[in-house]
Amino acid sequence: MLIITAPGQGAQTPGFLAPWLEVPGVAERLGAASELAGCDLIRYGTTADADEIRDTAIAQPLLVAAALAAAGALAGGAHADAAAGHSVGELAAGVLAGVLSADDAMRLVRVRGAAMAAAAAAEPTGMTAVLGGDEETVLAAIARHGLTPANINAAGQIVAAGAIADLAAFAADPPAGARLRPLQVAGAFHTRYMAPAVAALRDAAAEVAVTDPYLTLLCNADGAAVTTGKEWLERIVAQVAAPVRWDLCLRTMADLGVTAIIELPPAGTLTGLARRALPGVAQLALKTPDQLAAARDLIEEHLSESDGPGHGHLPEWRLIVAPTSGTFRSPAGRFDATATGAMVALTSELGTVVTRGGERSLATPWPAEIIEWLVEDGDPVSEGQPLVRVQPREGV
């Protein structure tokens, strides 16, 4: 059984995207993502320095766009049994599992990053990594100082978060046997200090159309697999102000019988945690395109052959529905709204729904074949109305 994972904030390093621009289609995907994110992700991923990409409002869109671009080069989430993301990486995992489109993921991460940055600026807060020590002792010390265990990543890796003054007191009175390392982040993410960001993200999420995952999709709140797109979206919103339990995600991977893990770029953090928590499980940190062949080999070796739901097999067909009411417009220069048999790549635009306030794009979360259009260019459509039937395909 194979799982694809997407890392969270802090994994980015200067220039990590540069080699990926040589892969056909990646620059175009990143260019489109940049428009949705409102910033030049190609520049931030290639020539920007560490301070620039540390900015929460930049780092979060950069991470999601990078993971999705690499997934597209790998042929998408169709080649996995399960998906999981750490913190903001959950948005990329949702796309791989077919819950939402890449465009909607970029719209959400733009709001998420900006809202979390604004919440962090409201009060002087921060985060400190706690390495080693007895877990119960560490958690008791964190609570004693009024802090929150914002990330419990694995045995011996917990991140405390809260007010700067409380973190200073914690540093002066550390748990026995533990080492403390202050993190260079803007604020106390995944704590109550992020409540304003939850409200902003909830408003943005109300505009997103979701479908149920066709992969086993793990969530950070408790490591559990979600079965509906609605539940996943609710969890994604709440997670901004709730601790990340990656340790429980790792436990679920073990319970599921995961035999291989591929981490999307900027890779290394999650495979490092898995190496200690899941000994014997094959891991590949996909850092450069040179590793794509090895990743495909790992997929071929470990992909489950089960025919049950949630085992990574593509659904027979899916409906793409209107995200809002308005007028449907087919994409100029690609194929008209009556065409069938057209093959579209992961995240390719299928058209737009135009409203008085703007337009919403349609995209498929999978590489797919157009089976049947249910509307024509210029038709009025209602929110939730089926627009097109598609057959997900591998390797489009």
Q: For each of these PLM feature ranges, what is it?
A:
Residues M1-T137, L183, A260-P289:
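FabD-like malonyl-/acyl-CoA
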Residues E349, T355, P386, P392-R393:
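Short, surface-exposed secondary-structure boundary micro-motifs
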Residues D307-S361, P367:
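Acidic, low-complexity mobile loops and tails
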Residues A282-E305:
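Short, flexible loop segments at boundaries between secondary-structure elements
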Residues Q9-A11, A37-C39, D49, L96-A241:
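Alpha/beta catalytic cores of group-transfer enzymes, especially the acyltransferase/condensing modules
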Residues A337, L374-V375:
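Exposed loop and linker-edge segments at protein-protein interfaces
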Residues A75, R251-G257:
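Non-catalytic positions within long, well-ordered alpha-helices that form the structural scaffold/packing
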